[in-house]
């Protein structure tokens, strides 16, 4: 698995100022403006070392004020968009002292970083097609000093410095980058002529999930569109949102062929350098909504019924040679008394080992959470299945210590046979795939 050079981290740590998360090239000076044309350089966790190595000489030569993350883990978190969607891709932030300096730095940084990869930065304007340089007019001191984010118009009126669509250039300013700026011809909501997205169900760095209407059939049907963005949340193994959606399409086709209740694929296509899956919309409800951690209704009988339905499905999946690696209640839908399974971006062949961990931390075996590879087997699914059963029986996640689980089993009256099955799943270390 590819890891970037740590040389750039050493150079960042030698920058004169740090707040623990960000390192700064120099202190803020009195003659530095409070607002202006802010530049951002985008990077993935794999391209960050090269982006920094090429950009730093340009910035140092111009004595530019800039900040960079102290750790790659911070960039990885920013690129996920989970905490703040507007921060995706913002590896280097530069605070030019004038419009002229902003134009010069944008031009030089674009040339210096040409050919490197980085995710598209939401709400910023892109300097040129395929450029890593983005810009927006905004407050500087909020980022440097933590003061409130407001900008002033020429007449003195204050406006909140919002990061939102169409807000990169305030309406009272001319865009000095307009000759090089990328023009968007995309019509909102329309992916293809016969697909109309009307609601974003989820939005993060690697892509979005949308409810849409498919106009290509009569009667028209509601569908789910899954988007994979190029360079979105690029992982240590080099896979980005685009690659994950393409991979999920392959997995879904194989699992449907094996008789698993996964969504049907209606269409797959690429547009604007992103990849899209048009999927069957699963009606019904998830076992547990994504924003809830524990079920409101619990009983060991309910846990047993879930196991009775879900365990044979996972056994069939494993017999087909696949491990899900993202088994959790929000990915399991109850539809007309039967279970339907969704979200297979992280699925892999049982014997594949060169992959980083995948899934929600509470459903990943503790021994696998900080590793950069996996051992062969179905242990991720086994552990997750044990966690789900425990949740619906006890109303909480299973304690790691066996004696604490035993106390909960006794206090809540868990049948011994079910208790043994759950503990066996939680302690699974080998593949349960049957050899034919």
Residue ranges and their predicted role:
Residues 1-213:
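Phosphate/pyrophosphate-binding loops and the adjoining catalytic core of nucleotide-dependent enzymes
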């Amino acid at each position: 698995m590819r890891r970037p050079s740590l040389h750039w981290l050493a150079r960042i740590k030698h920058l004169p100022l740090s707040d623990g998360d960000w390192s700064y090239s120099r202190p803020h000076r009195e003659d530095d403006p409070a607002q202006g044309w802010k530049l951002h350089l985008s990077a993935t966790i794999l391209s960050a070392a090269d982006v920094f190595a090429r950009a730093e000489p340009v910035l140092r030569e111009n004595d530019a004020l800039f900040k960079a993350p102290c750790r790659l883990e911070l960039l990885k978190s920013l690129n996920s968009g989970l905490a703040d969607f507007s921060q995706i891709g913002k590896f280097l932030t530069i605070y030019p002292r004038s419009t002229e300096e902003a134009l010069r730095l944008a031009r030089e940084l674009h040339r210096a970083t040409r050919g490197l990869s980085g995710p598209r930065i939401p709400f910023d304007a892109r300097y040129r097609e395929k450029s890593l340089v983005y810009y927006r007019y905004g407050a500087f001191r909020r980022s440097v000093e933590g003061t409130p984010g407001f900008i002033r118009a020429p007449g003195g009126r204050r406006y909140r410095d919002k990061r939102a669509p169409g807000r990169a250039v305030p309406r009272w300013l001319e865009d000095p980058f307009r000759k090089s700026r990328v023009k968007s011809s995309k019509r909102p909501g329309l992916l293809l002529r016969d697909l109309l997205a009307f609601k974003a169900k989820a939005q993060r760095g690697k892509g979005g999930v949308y409810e849409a209407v498919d106009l290509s059939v009569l009667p028209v049907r509601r569908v789910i569109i899954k988007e994979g963005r190029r360079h979105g949340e690029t992982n240590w193994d080099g896979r980005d949102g685009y690659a994950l959606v393409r991979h999920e399409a392959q997995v879904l086709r194989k699992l449907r062929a094996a008789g698993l209740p996964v969504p049907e694929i209606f269409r797959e296509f690429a547009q604007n350098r992103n990849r899209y899956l048009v999927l069957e919309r699963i009606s019904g409800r998830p076992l547990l909504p994504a924003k809830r951690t524990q079920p409101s209704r619990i009983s060991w009988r309910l846990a047993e019924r879930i196991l009775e339905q879900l365990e044979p499905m996972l056994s069939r999946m494993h017999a087909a040679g696949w491990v899900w690696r993202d088994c959790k209640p929000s990915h399991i839908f109850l539809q007309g008394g039967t279970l339907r399974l969704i979200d297979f971006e992280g699925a892999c062949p049982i014997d594949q080992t060169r992959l980083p961990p995948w899934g929600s931390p509470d459903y990943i075996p503790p021994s696998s959470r900080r590793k950069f590879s996996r051992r062969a087997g179905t242990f991720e699914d086994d552990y997750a299945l044990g966690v789900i059963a425990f949740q619906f029986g006890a109303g909480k996640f299973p304690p790691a210590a066996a004696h604490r689980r035993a106390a909960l089993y006794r206090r809540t009256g868990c049948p011994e046979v079910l208790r043994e099955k759950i503990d066996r799943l939680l302690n699974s270390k080998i593949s349960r795939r049957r050899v034919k």
